[in-house]
Swiss-Prot record:
PANTHER family, sorted: 37S RIBOSOMAL PROTEIN S26, MITOCHONDRIAL, SMALL RIBOSOMAL SUBUNIT PROTEIN MS42
Gene Ontology molecular function terms on file: metal ion binding; superoxide dismutase activity
EC number(s) reported in the record: 1.15.1.1
Tree of life domain: Bacteria
Record protein name field: Superoxide dismutase [Mn]
InterPro entries reported in the protein's UniProt record: Mn/Fe_SOD, Mn/Fe_SOD_BS, Mn/Fe_SOD_C, Mn/Fe_SOD_N, Mn/Fe_SOD_N_sf, SOD_C_sf
Protein purpose: Destroys superoxide anion radicals which are normally produced within the cells and which are toxic to biological systems.
Species, as recorded: Listeria ivanovii
A Pfam entry, by short name: Sod_Fe_C
Subunit description: Homodimer.
Enzyme class: oxidoreductase
Keyword vocabulary terms for this entry: Manganese, Metal-binding, Oxidoreductase
Length: 202
């Protein structure tokens, strides 16, 4: 298997005016692409690894040879994280979750607005580069953040929603205004896909 960029289900400018075309194009064709390239380089010569989906590699880092484990953690994580991120977005996004995910959020966090507040705080508080996540852990929802391209999958948690807070994800449009970028994220979330992912993760 050769790892490849996932096909985006929308054009680079489809999320305007929320997320700008230039950032989306650079983020996808440059940043995500280099993770895919470097992951393929890392597993080259390891046929037993190259046959596994990226998420499976990241979820089982202990099974990766030590000499390439760091590269798989970084670049496999970057590939898995960004693949989920793109699927989290939609030009017809926004609003709120429905169904089982809505019920689980309200059960765990109180209201949707209270959940948003806690998620925003996790994203804003991540020092330097990283991610904020809504994950399923032992059947329950949690909000966590990870550094760099570390994935919740490596901790046995299943990500449902992820927000990239590396500066490359927002700096061209928002400069140093990370909280504004975080607030804008809610306008483009594809809740239909998040609902499906939650149902599959339970």
């Amino acid at each position: 298997m050769t790892y490849e960029l996932p096909k985006l289900p929308y054009t680079y400018d489809a999320l305007e005016p929320n997320f700008d075309k230039e950032t989306m194009e650079i983020h996808y064709t440059k940043h995500h692409n280099i993770y895919v390239t470097k992951l393929n380089e890392a597993v080259s010569g390891h046929a037993e690894l190259a046959s596994k989906p990226g998420e499976e590699l990241v979820a089982n880092l202990d099974s990766v040879p030590e000499e390439i484990r760091g590269a798989v953690r970084n670049h496999g994580g970057g590939h898995a994280n960004h693949t989920l991120f793109w699927s989290s977005l939609s030009p017809n996004g926004g609003g709120a979750p429905t169904g089982n995910l809505k019920a689980a959020i309200e059960s765990e966090f109180g209201t949707f607005d209270e959940f948003k507040e806690k998620f925003n705080a996790a994203a804003a508080a991540r020092f330097g580069s990283g991610w904020a996540w809504l994950v399923v852990n032992n059947g329950k929802l949690e909000i966590v953040s990870t550094a760099n391209q570390d994935s919740p999958l490596s901790e046995g948690k299943t990500p449902v929603l992820g927000l990239d807070v590396w500066e490359h994800a927002y700096y061209l449009k928002f400069q140093n205004r990370r909280p504004e970028y975080i607030d804008t994220f809610w306008n483009v979330i594809n809740w239909d896909e998040r609902n499906k992912r939650f149902d599959a993760a339970k």
